[in-house]
Amino acid sequence: MGFVPLKEGTIKVGDTLLDKSTIDIIRRQIAWIPQELALPFEWVKEMVALPFDLKINRSVPFSEERLYEYFDELGLEHDLYTKRVNEVSGGQRQRIMLAVAAMLNKPLIIIDEPTSALDAGSTDKVLAFFRRQAEKGAAVLAVSHDKDFASGCHYLIEL
C-alpha cells in the first residue's frame, strides 16, 4: 500500500486513522488480492505459503485441511494445490488466494475484479463465499465491472 496524498478528508480502517505512523497496524488487518497475481512462483504450494511466511502473518497457522475446506466452498479441486502455477487458470489462482485470505482471518478482504475470469457458477460460489466471510465478521471490499456480481453485494458504490 503506497500513499497518494489526500487533498481533503481522512481514511479510517476500523477505528484506526490511516497515516504513515499507522500503516503497519492497518496492513495487519487487510488481506489484499489483486486481479492478476504476478508472483514468480513455479508451484501453487509456494504461492499459497507466501502469505504465511510474511512477518505479519507468522503467528497464523497453516492447515492443508482448512485450505481444502475453502477449496470445496469455492469449487476448486484439491489437486490444484500440487500443480504448477502455469497449469492453473487466472480464475483458479484468484479463488486459491481467496481461500488463503480466509485462512488469514483478517477483518478486511480487498479484492480487485474477483469474477473477471469466472463463469456464472463460479461467480455464484465466490459471492456465497464472501457472504460467509461477512457472517464471520469480515468486511469484503471488491472492485468489479460485473454488474451481476455487484447486484449480489450488500452495498454498491458506482463511480
Name each region found by the language model.
Residues E42-N57:
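Q-loop/switch helix immediately C-terminal to the Walker
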Residues R84-V88, Q92:
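Conserved ABC ATPase signature
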Residues L98-A99:
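Hydrophobic anchor residue at the start of the ABC signature
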Residues L6-L18, I26:
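Conserved ABC transporter NBD signature motif
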Residues M1:
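Helix-to-loop junction immediately C-terminal to a conserved catalytic motif
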Residues I109-E113:
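Catalytic Walker B motif of ABC-type/P-loop ATPase nucleotide-binding domains
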Residues P61-L80:
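Conserved ABC ATPase "signature" region
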